């Protein structure tokens, strides 16, 4: 029979009181439990299963469902939509919206194909979807290329159950339409405008067209062309021009923020992606000479981050006002991944990069409950044949905290892992750590839980364990650092950093509640939790009023059933450096 250890019963009834989230920093912590591979989807209106799921765009609708648009080939060929009622854990059968057809273009017999579907839900609930449509051969008939490429839109007034017929609104060689609606009702569509061709290659730039009537007309016309587009950005060098694949958000002050990749399909610049900003009054109505001479100049246009190189950027905005930029096919400090960077509320200083996996042609959006969803395209082999899938992950947002007096604490079995306000870690393994903070005149208090179905405990750091690095400013303005670790048997250590060595400051055992059997693989465990006070004199002395303490959380996970020789692996809170407490999140004492 499974043994239940209940060793911390007297005071285990409360969670550390945390006041309203301050307007400071945040980090994204990816959740291993939410990773999904979408390799195929039944197409319910056509009676077959689609096995290539590319170029995903996923957003939360007003009715609570998630909607995903996607395409089924690198260069098209058709657009689909699908819906989820369980936060992307499963997807209902897809609908193919438009079918590629045969016909004649300036190049003769040809195929009319579709690529790059993206959508928004308007303020009135209408879903507006746009895509590029082109004649496959006619696109490469360079003398007539602008006659053979279009943007079409479709809309749904019933949550995606039915759709209007496609309507052509734009003609001209182009790619990657994306849209944003402003509070005024204006809809902006951002386009990779490739109407100019030089050396048999596109010379792209980014333009915008506008609708003031819910998408019925654009640039005041039922049907506009590349000649009507308003230039936003173009990078020019001796080899040609660049800039494309735009998406945008509106910041709290009304300014608009838009990331771009800087390459032409062949050549690229050293700085990609870049971020473009316009104030509310200008609203992209900038100097149209940018088309000929390039621009805008710094600071209106700047590198997203000095350590990031990536493509196909996508942007979203959190309720806190912070923008997030996803870059696919990317490297951050030399490490490959689909990287998400956090900006400040002014749309600047992007950093604190995190990545759950590699991928390209992706999206990111806020989906509620302090969570974001990311989706990317990944290629793989299926019986030797190349296929493409969509991979998704949900990230939880860890906000800087204001910590007050300890409040009510709940036992692990009663802890709500979905809604709790704690910091979270759990990307690397099907195991999760939750941490919160409080304080009393005597101690800095850490409330912590670890959930794992196989609990192992040896020494504190060679266990399934919770770790917290603590940083406090000293008189010289530097940080003194401390390391606290506790496992399911209540064994803990507290170290003080001296130079490059950790020096033991305290150790022992503390009460914990462990639900399960430690080091027994014959059953399924739940995890452990506890409240862990660290006396102020052990970490530098009594705090100043309103002091900002820096904290960085760790997740130790033990993947072997033996104590050695293999030790526990450490998952660190991403987006910050363990050697620099200044980069860690704030815990402000109130």
Predicted segments, located by residue:
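Bacterial N-terminal signal peptides
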Residues: 7-15
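Asp-box/BNR beta-propeller blade signature and adjacent active/binding-site loops
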Residues: 21-402
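An N-terminal domain-cap segment
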Residues: 50, 413-436
């Amino acid at each position: 029979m499974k043994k239940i250890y209940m060793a911390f019963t007297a005071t285990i009834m409360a969670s550390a009181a945390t006041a309203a989230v301050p307007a400071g920093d945040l980090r994204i912590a990816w959740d291993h439990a939410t990773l999904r591979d979408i390799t195929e989807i039944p197409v319910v209106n056509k009676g077959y299963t689609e096995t290539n799921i590319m170029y995903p765009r996923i957003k939360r609708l007003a009715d609570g469902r998630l909607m995903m648009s996607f395409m089924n080939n690198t260069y098209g060929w058709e657009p689909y939509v699908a819906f989820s009622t369980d936060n992307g854990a499963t997807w209902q059968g897809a609908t193919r919206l438009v079918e590629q057809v045969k016909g004649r273009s300036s190049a003769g017999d040809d195929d009319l194909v579709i690529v790059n579907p993206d959508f928004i839900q308007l303020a009135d609930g209408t879903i507006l979807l746009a895509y590029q449509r082109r004649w496959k051969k006619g696109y490469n008939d360079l003398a007539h290329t602008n006659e053979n490429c279009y943007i079409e839109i479709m809309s749904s007034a019933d949550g995606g159950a039915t759709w209007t017929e496609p309507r052509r609104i734009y003609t001209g060689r182009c790619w990657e339409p994306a849209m944003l609606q402003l509070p005024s009702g204006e809809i902006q569509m951002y386009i990779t405008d490739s109407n100019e061709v030089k050396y048999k290659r596109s010379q792209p730039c980014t333009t915008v067209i506008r609708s003031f009537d819910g998408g019925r007309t654009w640039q005041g016309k039922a049907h506009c062309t590349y000649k009507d587009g308003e230039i936003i950005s173009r990078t020019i060098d001796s080899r040609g021009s660049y800039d494309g694949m735009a998406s945008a958000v509106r910041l709290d002050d009304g300014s608009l923020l838009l990331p771009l990749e800087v390459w032409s399909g062949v050549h690229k610049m050293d700085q990609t992606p870049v971020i473009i900003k316009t104030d509310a009054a200008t609203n992209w109505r900038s100097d149209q000479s940018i088309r000929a001479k390039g621009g805008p100049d710094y600071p209106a246009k700047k590198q997203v981050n000095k350590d990031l190189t990536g493509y196909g950027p996508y942007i979203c905005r959190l309720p806190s006002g912070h923008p997030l930029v996803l870059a696919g096919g990317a490297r951050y400090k030399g490490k490959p991944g689909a990287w998400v960077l956090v900006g400040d509320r002014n749309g600047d200083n992007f950093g604190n990069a995190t990545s759950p996996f590699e991928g390209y042609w992706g999206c990111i959006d806020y989906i509620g409950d302090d969570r974001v969803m990311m989706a990317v395209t990944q290629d793989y082999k299926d019986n030797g044949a190349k296929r493409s899938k969509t991979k998704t992950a949900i990230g939880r947002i860890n906000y800087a905290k204001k910590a007050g007096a300890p409040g009510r604490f709940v036992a692990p079995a009663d802890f709500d892992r979905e809604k709790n306000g704690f910091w979270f870690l759990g990307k690397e393994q099907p195991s999760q750590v939750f941490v919160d903070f409080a304080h009393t005149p005597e101690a800095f208090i850490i409330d912590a839980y670890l959930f794992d179905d196989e609990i192992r405990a040896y020494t504190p750091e060679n266990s399934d364990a919770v770790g917290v690095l603590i940083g406090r400013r000293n008189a010289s303005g530097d940080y003194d650092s401390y390391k606290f670790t506790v496992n399911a048997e209540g064994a803990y250590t507290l170290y003080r950093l001296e130079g490059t060595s950790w020096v033991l400051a305290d150790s022992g055992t503390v009460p914990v509640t462990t639900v399960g059997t430690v080091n027994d693989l014959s059953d399924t465990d739940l995890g452990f939790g506890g409240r862990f006070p660290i006396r102020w004199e052990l970490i530098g002395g009594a705090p100043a009023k309103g002091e900002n303490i820096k904290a960085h959380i760790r997740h130790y996970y033990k993947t072997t059933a033996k104590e050695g020789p293999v030790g526990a692996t450490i998952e660190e809170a991403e987006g910050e450096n363990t050697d620099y407490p200044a980069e860690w999140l704030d815990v402000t004492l109130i």
